[in-house]
Design a protein with these regions (language model features):
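GST-like domain detector, emphasizing the conserved glutathione-binding G-site
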Residues: 1-9, 15-78
Length: 78
């Protein structure tokens, strides 16, 4: 399973998720949407540019999680 977090460094909800990732030592690819490439990939893949967004890739399937609470809950059950 591959995890990628689309985030903005100024977003308080993103900071909450980032702190959880750091605390739990989860291996997540961080993608700052300040980069045009990451912002475009988020819109193309997930359909919107809302952050935070966790992309979960497993067995050829993609799942896009957008709410910080949902993302944190998902990470806690890994």
């Amino acid at each position: 399973m591959k995890l990628s977090l689309y985030y903005s460094p100024w977003c308080p909800f993103c900071i909450r998720v980032l702190n959880t990732i750091k605390k739990m030592s989860v291996d997540v690819d961080l993608r700052d949407t300040g980069s045009r490439a990451h912002s475009s990939a988020l819109k193309k893949g997930g359909g919107k540019t809302q952050v935070p967004c966790l992309l979960v890739e497993k067995a050829g399937e993609e799942k896009w999680l957008y709410e910080s609470g949902d993302i944190i809950q998902f990470l806690k059950v890994l």
